[in-house]
Amino acid sequence: MEQLYNSTIAAISTAMSNSGIGIVRMSGPEAFQIADRVYKGKKEKKLCDQKSHTIHYGYIVDGEQVIDEVLVMLMRGPHSYTGEDTVEINCHGGVYVVKRILELLIKNGARPAEPGEYTKRAFLNGRLDLSQAEAVGDLIASQNEYALQSSVSQLKGNIKDKISEMREKILYHTAFIETALDDPEHISVDGYGETLKKVVDEIMEAMKRLLDSCDDGRIIKEGVRTVILGKPNAGKSSLLNVLLGEDRAIVTDIAGTTRDVLEEHLNLKGISLNIMDTAGIRDTEDVVEKIGVDRAKEYADKADLILYVIDASRPLDENDAEILHLIKGKRAIILLNKSDLDMQVTKEQEELPEEFPVIEISAKNVQGIEELEDTLKEMFFQGELTFNDEIYITNVRQKTALQDAYAALERVNDSIAAEMPEDFYSIDLMDAYEALGNITGETIGEDLVNEIFSTFCMGK
């Protein structure tokens, strides 16, 4: 920890590829002084003497050699991202240029930043809580509008505020019980269990709402695990190609062309899909194809969504019956493909369960795809997600901490129901308090903090 506050770190904050602009960032007590050793302005002015939140035009130099023409941004702590003195050098974005400037800063007293160290310093300096720090990583990694908005909501402190509210209530009642136990002559806890239960139930209800958001949260962050199922030659690979907008899967008239799982990522109306094209479901003596069929069933069992493609130009058979049995009770959409041909299967077919939406499509003619997209969006997010009041837990670590806190409050209610001594309430209340603190980082261990930030990119 001592090294953290006594050292000045430097890293490249932009992508390591040739581009118009590159940014090299420094943070720490010597940031301005190190910058002065390599910066030369037109008026020979020292950066150390300049005001915070100002931008200065000049050159980065190594002795008499000019390295690049730059704009240098100054931010004095605590009014910076890290809470420390920060310098951002905006240079030309050539890979060699930014690396050369970074090497020059290190030569003049900075040390290379560890992965995620800027955000880690922001957390340790109180600029962000841990849920907000994790939101920074999620924001950078977001692949769709929902993931972006969820990360922004968390970065604004929505989770922090909700968790802090719960912790304050728990701490208040824990403190009251502890005080009463220490001074029973002046403070009575007779009948307090009933009062406490109302508060605990209220907090648990708020926790349950957060826990109920976890499935949607995972889908927002990671995408919908989607499996395309159907018999051979039903048009599964054609559908994948249409959704991707490119010929990714091989399409032929030969049954059994797809023998393994082909996985791709795509966005449909703001929703990320991790979509898998699988081998056609049928009885087969071919050993390799049979492995593919078994794997298709295995993936379907773990899927968030199944797109069951039926060749509607042919009657249903025993293989369709097997697939319908396979998807029973799951989240699925039935797609009647080849609607441009004489249809032998219709939406009204009695074999098709009413629990599933049924859509007529033609992968060949790109018909019905928009209806599929709308149905998918409605199926997962009731047509729209809002981030004004709703909070979505997208982080497994946060979910686990919430579950631990919820279990602790369940124990409090059990103790109240069993009329246990009040000190039992206090123990479990503190367990809940500390579990919630793991979400915001107020009660988390240093090793876990290091592990979390090690997953960040170098310049963040």
Predicted segment positions?
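Short glycine-/polar-rich loops that comprise or flank the Walker A/P-loop
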Residues: 19-21, 53-55, 302-306, 329-332, ...
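A glycine-rich (often HGG/GG-containing) alpha/beta subdomain
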Residues: 1-149, 153, 157, 333
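Switch I (G2) and immediately adjacent beta-strands of P-loop GTPase domains
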Residues: 56-68, 72-76, 256-284, 302-305
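Short glycine-/small-residue-rich Rossmann-like dinucleotide-binding loops
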Residues: 244, 279-280, 304, 311, ...
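Inter-motif core of Ras-like GTPase G domains
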Residues: 289-313
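Generic enzyme active-site microenvironment
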Residues: 275, 309, 335
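C-terminal-of-GTPase-core extension/linker across diverse P-loop GTPases
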Residues: 3-12, 16, 145-267, 284-286, ...
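Conserved beta-strand segments of alpha/beta enzyme cores
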Residues: 111, 272-274, 357
